[in-house]
Amino acid sequence: MEKPELWGVLALLLLCSYTCGSQDLQVIDLLTVGESRQMVAVAEKIRTALLTAGDIYLLSTFRLPPKQGGVLFGLYSRQDNTRWLEASVVGKINKVLVRYQREDGKVHAVNLQQAGLADGRTHTALLRLRGPSRPSPGLQLYVDCKLGDQHAGLPALAPIPPAEVSGLEIRTGQKAYLRMQGFVESMKIILGGSMARVGALSECPFQGDDSIHNAVTSALQSILGEQTKALVTQLTLFNQILVELRDDIRDQVKEMSLIRNTIMECQVCGFHEQRSHCSPSPCFRGVDCMEVYEYPGYRCGPCPPGLQGNGTHCDDINECAHADPCFPGSSCINTMPGFHCEACPPGYKGTRVSGVGIDYARASKQVCNDIDECNDGNNGGCDPNSICTNTVGSFKCGPCRLGFLGNQSQGCVPARTCHSPAHSPCHIHAHCLFERNGAVSCQCNVGWAGNGNVCGPDTDIDGYPDQALPCMDNNKHCKQDNCLLTPNSGQEDADNDGVGDQCDDDADGDGIKNVEDNCRLFPNKDQQNSDTDSFGDACDNCPNVPNNDQKDTDGNGEGDACDNDVDGDGIPNGLDNCPKVPNPLQTDRDEDGVGDACDSCPEMSNPTQTDADSDLVGDVCDTNEDSDGDGHQDTKDNCPQLPNSSQLDSDNDGLGDECDGDDDNDGVPDYIPPGPDNCRLVPNPNQKDSDGNGVGDVCEDDFDNDAVVDPLDVCPESAEVTLTDFRAYQTVILDPEGDAQIDPNWVVLNQGMEIVQTMNSDPGLAVGYTAFNGVDFEGTFHVNTVTDDDYAGFLFSYQDSGRFYVVMWKQTEQTYWQATPFRAVAQPGLQLKAVTSISGPGEHLRNALWHTGHTPDQVRLLWTDPRNVGWRDKTSYRWRLLHRPQVGYIRVKLYEGPQLVADSGVIIDTSMRGGRLGVFCFSQENIIWSNLQYRCNDTVPEDFEPFRRQLLQGRV
């Protein structure tokens, strides 16, 4: 065969090697799978491949924001949400999590480390499932063409029954039933094929399988033909002859050598018995000697362990010089034979090592571990209130801890403390608080305002003193209140005249009184109003379209009534399946015309979005089955058997922190050995704690790692809640039928920390969207009118429109003017009620709320102020609520100025095990809820202890 022909054959074989490995390859673009029939067909292909294919690949290109994550691909059962196969990115801890159904029915999870996918950049990830039908499949993760991690010998995948195929669902790019943040460029699943072929699809030069080489070899043999085979056969026979000839020559040489030695012995010594060459032994002591035919007639075995040489002469091996087996700083002593290491150097602990031979010395090196002197129970000998820092082989004593003054020689003494008035930095009208890191802070008492070190009277209890205070830190709460008698915690002043808008009769300074001004906060002397609403053109976000609510969802300055793209997602309202919620991808899994981003039942068709009980779950998928009573139905609860209304899931593994033994998934259990984890919400497997205060370095000042330091964080153990904010709220109307009164009108000020209700309205609620477990909730209540005498208050543990707690206050005794369906009489005084209405909003709940007392199947009166004193016009009151739903603890206190005027005492009720917060009004106008503050708190107060004992004895 000529060379050109041979090169052509080789080229053809190379082409075959590339294509032969991909004969059964199927590529499916998952982003195009939409219709149910198409999804069933794709699911059947995947099911078949799991049973028959050699390998299955998931190839995706996407971009995730830093520390974000979500499900890349999942194959689930619609009926019971069984997770057959799922691959997700856990951005916070830099891994890919693969979960699948095992043959025993349990879910198996595989962590693939070193992913580095959630960093705001575009990555290509290839997940290879090797041998899914084998008893022990494997997983490989390639990130940007490089192998990141792999696992072999995994438990077998459970086969998907054929009957399940029609009920299978494929999900891509999701996080908690919503689209995950970022951008998914492509998502393909490849059934069968080789790594070489898949690498070509992703432009990655992966090596092919051995099967390709075998195919090339087979093809080459078939092309070269019978003549070459015959030639190869002859060459093989020739080679065998050469081997036999070489063996014959070797035997001849041995025989000739024996004859020569015999002749020489006969000539020199005559004919006598042959002398042994091994007696006496010419070999080194302890080395075996063997008689041989070759000169000099003997052969010595190998030198003993620890020695080297030819068997005749053996010298000691210096293991210390050649293997360096001892820890740096520990002396190595060479012996004859062998070596030994002396004790570990000071500051280290370990074992002495000794042995014989280079191999042993290299495999058994001495290990000495650093001694952490700072954890010896004596702070390393440093002052107990100072910082001890461990170093490699030693330690050093540092400065005094936070809250202490001094040095190592004089000792560290408390600088500020809450335990002793002599060391307390707080004002006489302030109370001392311990922060999480041991620092001390001060907070002015109710009726006083300032920075805590300096406090002054605060008549309207809005957090600002009546007179300016000489504070060293220039704290804003030391500035004089611009409305002394009317709460305005935001200190808004549109015309900058030093008088706050809340008490300025001409807030914008345009010469027109507020009651007559159609733009209270914008100067407009001409009072021009082009449309028919009550807002002048100068302050109307739709000057030519009537819109009294002035709603502006996307905050672009253009009201929703005249904005062609209300949510600002780039999709016109008429084409947007979520007109008021940004969703540029327009994902709609249930194909009901309502996008998943705003769908109250994203997996079940409900185009009308009916939600009769206002619990944010559509009626068609609302089961109202809530085993733990935390306001989340079991099918959507990440801890269905433990109350956790906040649904906090720090590691995004689908298991709520309340029932997750390792909240941050760093391998250190939260509470049990080898824990407890000193940073329970932030991954830190090394548990480094430089100052030894029990809090890891990575979460020292920010326990939940939400970029808000703990003293300023209202929920230091939840990265989802940082500040009090009611700007996003849900309006719940409790008497939606009839037109006797109008609905409430809520105005939110001070960045969500102040709410004003302006209308004489039907009963209604403004409910925030943040749900709480244990919570402390406080605020200032003020009725800014003298023309009405009805109900106002606040609510907590809101779960739906028929289940919540409400604290409500009536000014005077009054019988409700509608006696249907029953007569309702309101008594003056503060009341605490548990609403457990079986009917929900309507006339029954309306009259039950008005009535002071129990109403079967509607409202239970838990407590009422025995003074029967109503609120006074234009007077500020401060409430403080403590609620610990895990034990049913409730306590409400009410202050008028600095004086405590009402205290419910400890009340035990477990009707609602957590929920959302909000405010309440019923037929009362001009209510101000100012200086609102909430704080997550699961610590049970000390005054619960007597009730705990009674609960254990079954007496409560």
UniProtKB/Swiss-Prot annotation:
Record-linked Gene3D superfamilies: 1.20.5.10, 2.60.120.200, Laminin (2.10.25.10), TSP type-3 repeat (4.10.1080.10)
Coiled-coil positions: none
Disulfide bonds: 278-289, 283-300, 303-314, 320-332, 326-341, 344-368, 374-388, 382-397, 400-412, 418-432, 426-442, 444-455, 471-478, 483-503, 519-539, 542-562, 578-598, 601-621, 639-659, 679-699, 715-936
CDD domains: EGF_CA (cd00054), TSP-3cc (cd16079)
TSP type-3 repeats: 457-491, 492-527, 528-550, 551-586, 587-609, 610-647, 648-687, 688-723
Expression tissues: Brain, lung and cartilage.
Signal sequence range: 1-21
Annotated GO biological process: bone trabecula formation; cell adhesion; growth plate cartilage development; ossification involved in bone maturation
Acidic residues composition-biased segments: 555-568, 612-628, 650-667
TSP C-terminal domain location: 727-941
Molecular functions per Gene Ontology: calcium ion binding; heparin binding
Region of interest (Disordered), ranges: 518-537, 546-699
Residues with glycosylation annotation: 310, 407, 644, 937
Keyword Calcium listed: yes
Keyword annotations of the record: Calcium, Cell adhesion, Disulfide bond, EGF-like domain, Glycoprotein, Repeat, Signal
Pfam families in the record: COMP, EGF_CA, TSP_3, TSP_C
Protein origin, superkingdom: Eukaryota
Laminin G-like domain sequence ranges: 22-193
Ranges for domain EGF-like: 316-354, 370-410, 414-456
Record note on quaternary structure: Oligomer; disulfide-linked.
Cited function: Adhesive glycoprotein that mediates cell-to-cell and cell-to-matrix interactions. Can bind to fibrinogen, fibronectin, laminin and type V collagen.
Family that this chain belongs to: Belongs to the thrombospondin family.
Protein name: Thrombospondin-3
